[in-house]
A protein has these predicted regions:
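Outer-membrane pore/translocation modules
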Residues: 25-33, 89-236, 242, 262, ...
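Outer membrane beta-barrel transmembrane domains
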Residues: 221, 226-326
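Short N-terminal helix-initiation segments at or just after the protein's N-terminus
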Residues: 40-43, 204-208, 246-251
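Residue-level signature of outer-membrane beta-barrel architecture
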Residues: 81-89, 134-138, 194-202, 245-249, ...
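Short glycine/proline- and aromatic-enriched beta-strand/turn motifs that initiate or cap beta-hairpins
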Residues: 20-118, 326
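Charged interaction patches that mediate protein-protein contacts
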Residues: 1, 205-209, 322-326
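Sec-dependent signal peptide recognition
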Residues: 2-11
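N-terminal signal peptide c-region/cleavage motif recognized by signal peptidases
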Residues: 14-17
């Protein structure tokens, strides 16, 4: 659901090539800072269960005469859920239950330069990341709850540069020596979050209003090039309206349900800068079989699909829609 990082290297180089200039030390430092933000953003986007995966495309002209397009594929497996039924919190009129969360993801990003001396070159990013954690959901009444959680995430990001242009082939070794391309970096991320939910029941239809604020603190601990180190903070704020509608039709002994959600996620810090995306909207629809009465099994299984859009980015995803009850 987010836009992939475009080739910052080619954008900066092309603006200097047109004037016959070299990259200064300060500009090289600025380029590396932007690359670090891209690593931070792609790692989070590649695995965080709060951000949707899918197929994404973006294009534009970041600098005059520097047209580019970018394609990104994000595959994720994971999610989160509440464990058991709410228990009383001492003598207080508050219920509580554990929350578990986890996700793993893979991201592949290809950035194509479409104009100038570097036309035909491509900068590619690959990300593998995994996260796990949990917290406690506190029920203030039967409808309103709040869940503080903490997760940890490990990620590995690698970059390769396909020098197809004459200029690229002649200079790619210099790019590599400067640590601009062809590197690997390992990162860890701490992810505290606060989720607020309100449930509405209309006959048998369930409406869930939620607001999820997340903070990310990311640092690298290993890199193939000493010039590539990552330290950054990011944030996201997701607001969602989810509707679950029972259809009263049995299939294989289970009731058929439909529904979906509409959400808007604001991005902040390195996540916004690295993806060059301010927000992402998502509309999702699903058709599932209900397993609601069976604990420690899927709550529902079916199919679902989403369309996502935001600043200069579009995306889509279709797949198996599963929710578990523990």
């Amino acid at each position: 659901m987010a836009k992939q990082a475009f080739s910052l290297l080619t954008l900066l180089l092309f603006s200097h090539l047109a004037a016959g200039q070299n990259i200064s030390g300060s500009e090289l430092g600025q380029l590396r800072d932007t690359q670090r933000a891209s690593v931070e953003a792609l790692t989070i986007f590649g695995a965080d269960f709060g951000l949707s995966g899918g197929e994404f495309h973006t294009s534009g002209e970041r600098l005059p005469g520097t047209a580019f397009s970018a394609d990104m594929s994000v595959n994720k497996f994971g999610g989160g859920g509440d464990v058991g039924a709410p228990q009383s919190l001492g003598t207080l009129p508050i219920g509580w239950q554990p929350v578990i969360q986890g996700s793993m993801g893979w991201l592949d990003s290809t950035n194509h330069l479409e104009t100038g001396p570097l036309k035909g070159d491509a900068s590619k990013y690959s990300v593998y990341a995994i996260q796990f954690g949990g917290g406690i959901r506190f029920w203030l009444n039967e409808a309103l709850s709040v869940a503080p959680t903490v997760m940890g995430m490990y990620g590995r990001t690698s970059n390769t540069y396909d020098a197809n242009s004459l200029y690229g082939r002649e200079n790619v070794s210099g790019f590599m020596q400067r640590g601009i391309v062809d590197w690997e970096v390992d990162t860890w991320t701490v992810r505290p979050a606060l989720d607020l939910q309100y449930l509405l029941t209309l006959h048998r239809t369930i409406v869930t209003l939620s607001s999820d604020a997340v903070f990310f603190d990311t640092e690298s601990f290993s890199s193939s090039n000493k010039s590539m180190s990552v330290v950054g903070t990011s944030g996201s704020w997701d607001n969602k309206l989810d509707v679950d509608v029972p259809l009263g039709v049995l299939v294989l002994g289970h009731e058929l349900r439909t529904g979906g959600y509409l959400s808007r996620t604001e991005l902040y810090g390195g996540l916004r800068n690295g993806l060059d995306v301010k927000y992402i909207n998502e509309v999702h629809a699903r058709l599932v079989l209900d397993f609601l009465s069976q604990r420690w099994r899927p709550q529902w299984i079916g199919i679902g699909g989403s369309y996502l859009w935001g600043t200069s980015i579009t995306g889509w995803t279709v797949g198996v829609d599963v929710m578990f009850r523990f």
